[in-house]
Amino acid sequence: MAYASLATGVLLAAGYGSRFDPAGLHNKLLARMPDGGIVAHEAAHRLLLVVSHVLAVVRPGSEALAHVLNEAGCDVVFSSDAERGMGASLAAGIDASADSEGWIVALADMPRIAVATVEAVARTLDGGASIVVPFYQGQRGHPVGFGPEHLDALRELDGDTGARALLATHRVTRLDLDDPGILRDVDTPEDLRGM
């Protein structure tokens, strides 16, 4: 680990992935990428190279995914409210790490974010920024950093919009980076083949 952030990583892994497999038989986060890596494991690994403590939030019944994330080095939080959406899952991760110096929130279906991007977000957050957001060619991506002053607002999140309202109503430090991985997620089998 070249840089060790003071923040806690929150890896959101509680979605249903219905576009990847409408029948719900295969969890996209457990799918193998063309290089053989597992989607969620790779996303966790990249976060853990910068953030020493990562909480992965999964939904109940995702024991195989929890095992993979534990093996990657994450602590796992089961969110009983995961069906209510990303906001509820994020709130569960924040609640489980309320004493943190800040949070770097990443999505488990985004395995190609450059480690340098995670480090840039972490350094900016650790340097005192309130909210840090990476951009690539004008588009907002992940991971997003939140300072400790947002604890209460993050704990109250619910629904499927995640923390978008916080981004819209608070000062955001924008990082323009050359990393298309901040926008690339695995929503379909075609996305996976393109990784």
Regions found by a protein language model. Give the residues of each.
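Conserved alpha/beta core of the MobA/IspD/sugar-nucleotide pyrophosphorylase nucleotidyltransferase superfamily
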Residues: M1-G9, D152-M195
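Alpha-helical elements of Rossmann-like donor-binding domains used by nucleotide-donor carbohydrate transfer enzymes
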Residues: E42, A64, A88-A92, A120, ...
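Conserved beta-loop-beta/alpha segment of the NTase-like Rossmann-fold superfamily
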Residues: D81-P148, D152-R155
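Short beta->alpha connector loops at strand-helix junctions that form conserved
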Residues: P34, V77-D81, L175-L177
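Conserved beta-strand segments of alpha/beta enzyme cores
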Residues: L29, D75, S130, R171-T173, ...
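N-terminal glycine-rich phosphate-binding loop and ensuing alpha1 helix
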Residues: A2-R59, E63
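Short, surface-exposed acidic-centric catalytic microdomains
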Residues: S52-A92
